[in-house]
Amino acid sequence: QALVCGTDFHYASHNSGSIHTLKAQERIEIIAIDPLMEDQIEKISSSKIEKEIEAGRIEEANASLGYMYSIDGTIRHGFQRGSKILNIPTANLEPDSLFTLPAIGVYAGYMKLKNSYYPAMINIGFNPTFGNTHKSIEAHVLDFDQDLYGKKVSFLFVQKIRPEHKFDSIEALKTQLKQDIETTRQILAKKSIQDWSSVINLL
């Protein structure tokens, strides 16, 4: 048996334990891994990646992770405004567990269904134009017309497009969403799912 950990690993009350105290006990082999560095300056750590995600810096987070950050969950019924009012249907995700949520805003990304990946415009926020008080995670899956209710999917994030805004009218919102869809296409044309082919089978 062996324990693989970083050289700065600590445990126990007030972080009083370290790899040195573990090695002194001689109960298990300790394999210490030197930290990964970004540009030989900043250490790549889980807390650094979490901060990048929370700030909406998805490109930086993905570069540190080596794969696209994703949230897993089940598609549930929403208000159906996307299909009935905006004519831009969205799939509302109920996360399976606690995830670090990216900053409120609109993102280019993918929806994974089974072993297939579909381009998607993802929104995290409150839909302020409609006065929502509950934060939602929803995606408009491009050129997709299958029934997703009850399906297990993953939303994968590639790049933030813009912050969330409150629009003066439904028409103004629709116009912006159409622009967001086009921006999503442009981003994903440059950063396609094939670019992650070396790690995609690990997701």
List the model feature ranges, each with a label.
Residues Q1-I88, D168-A172, S198:
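Classical nucleotidyltransferase
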